[in-house]
């Protein structure tokens, strides 16, 4: 048990409505990739959600929660359109990621999609059933610009209930609750242990669910 777990759990219990559950809802891995990459260092509701909606309007009959939009479909569309035209005319976003050597986000999307294609991962079900989740995590983490937050968030979007995305809002909450910050790795352990303590009163609560509750609360204050 993490040494700060009890303190963090008490803070969450007293600060948030823990009955509010997140609905990620995507049924196609293509939009999970887009949401993941374009949410990093961006305003989620102002930038990411409209961007995913634009992709869905162009290719998914207007429904970002539709199933059947595979990784290979995303790759083919980017190849046919051209990466810059895809960025300019479909998702309409020219953001970059990656410290000093920044890379356009559409190139990060493409690289991640190609890695999945090489592993024969086309759907959310393929992702969830991949034979070695540890290898999958290493592969995702190797994509330029994703880091711990992007890696964990993609797992969350693809249905993993046991992860948190250690972004600026999550770390802000940890500092408020515990008086100090923790590493990304500790953040995962802290959320996991806090949820274990809270489940007696909140049996439906998951790590992913607590992450969503915390994130929405702190994002609204930003």
Language-model features: where?
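Short, hydrophobic/amphipathic alpha-helical patches that form generic packing surfaces
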Residues: 31-43, 108-115, 156, 209-219
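Intrinsically disordered, low-complexity, charged terminal extensions of DNA damage-control enzymes
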Residues: 1-17, 219-221
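Structural motif
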Residues: 20-31, 43, 96-105, 201-206
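Alpha-helical ds-nucleic-acid-binding substructure associated with the helix-hairpin-helix region
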Residues: 61-144
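A basic, often C-terminal nucleic-acid-binding module that engages the phosphate backbone, implemented
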Residues: 185-222
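Non-catalytic DNA-binding core/recognition domains of DNA-processing enzymes
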Residues: 28, 45-58, 65-68, 102-112, ...
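Catalytic DNA-binding helix-loop module of base-excision-repair DNA glycosylases/AP lyases
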Residues: 38, 130-180
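Alpha-helix N-cap and coil->helix boundary residues
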Residues: 46-50, 104, 165, 169, ...
């Amino acid at each position: 048990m993490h040494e700060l777990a009890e303190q963090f759990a008490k803070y969450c219990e007293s600060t948030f409505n823990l009955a509010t559950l997140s609905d990620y809802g995507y049924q196609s891995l293509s939009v999970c990739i887009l949401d993941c990459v374009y949410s990093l260092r961006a305003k989620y509701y102002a930038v990411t959600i409209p961007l995913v909606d634009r992709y869905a309007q162009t290719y998914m009959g207007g429904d970002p929660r539709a199933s059947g939009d595979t990784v290979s479909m995303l790759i083919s569309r980017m190849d046919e359109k051209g990466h810059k035209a895809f960025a300019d005319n479909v998702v309409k976003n020219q953001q970059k990621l990656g410290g000093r050597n920044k890379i356009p986000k559409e190139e990060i999307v493409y690289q991640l999609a190609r890695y999945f294609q090489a592993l024969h991962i086309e759907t959310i079900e393929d992702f969830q059933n991949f034979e070695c989740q540890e290898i999958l995590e290493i592969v995702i983490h190797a994509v330029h610009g994703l880091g711990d937050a992007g890696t964990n968030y993609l797992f969350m979007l693809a249905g993993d209930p046991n992860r948190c995305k250690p972004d600026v809002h999550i770390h802000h909450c940890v500092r408020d609750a515990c008086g100090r910050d923790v590493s990304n790795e500790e953040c995962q352990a802290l959320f996991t242990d806090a949820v274990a303590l809270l489940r007696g009163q909140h049996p439906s609560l998951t790590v992913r669910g607590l992450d969503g509750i915390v994130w929405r609360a702190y994002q609204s204050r930003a």
